[in-house]
Structures are given as C-alpha cells and as structure tokens.
C-alpha cells in the first residue's frame, strides 16, 4: 500500500463565498523581517474547495493542500472551526 506525503494545513478566515463550491480564505502569517528582525503580519489568500457550500463569510476554517482542482484551487476544506456570528 502506498502512503501519501504529508499535506500542508492552514487555518484562516473566509473572506468570500460568492463562487459555487469555492471559498477564499485569508491566512495571516507572522514572519521575521530578514534585516531588522521585527515580526511582520503577512496576509495571503487561498482558494479552497467547499463541496457542500457550507461556509459563510467570517467563518474560521482549516484547509488542507490537495491536487489541483482548477486554475487557482489547490486547497480543500477540512473543517469549520468556528461559525461566524
């Protein structure tokens, strides 16, 4: 039996759910500036596959890396950590 490689997982906030079966997740990453050493917040967006259209804007979600599903989609929804109020 072939074992799969480890998949990257990210936690972020849903910023768009206007597409069918797709959500846009904003992930905040704290990186150290190479010269000055200050911790800087960097935000990047991922398109993720949401098969049942269950996410809404403001939800905190966990996404996992997967095979390419379209031109921009390389992540899929694993779980909804917290629903939006």
From Swiss-Prot:
SUPFAM superfamilies named among the record's database cross-references: Nucleic acid-binding proteins
One GO cellular component this record assigns the protein to is:
cytosolic small ribosomal subunit
Instruction: Please name the GO terms that the record assigns under molecular function.
Output: rRNA binding; structural constituent of ribosome
| Keywords recorded for this protein, A-Z | Ribonucleoprotein, Ribosomal protein, RNA-binding, rRNA-binding
InterPro entries annotated for this entry? Answer: NA-bd_OB-fold, Ribosomal_uS17, Ribosomal_uS17_bact/chlr, Ribosomal_uS17_CS
Quote the HAMAP family the UniProt record gives. Ribosomal_uS17_B (MF_01345_B)
Physiological role: One of the primary rRNA binding proteins, it binds specifically to the 5'-end of 16S ribosomal RNA.
> Quaternary arrangement and interactors, per the entry?
Part of the 30S ribosomal subunit.
Q: What is this protein called?
A: Small ribosomal subunit protein uS17
Q: Which organism is it from?
A: Lachnoclostridium phytofermentans (strain ATCC 700394 / DSM 18823 / ISDg) (Clostridium phytofermentans)
| The encoding gene | rpsQ
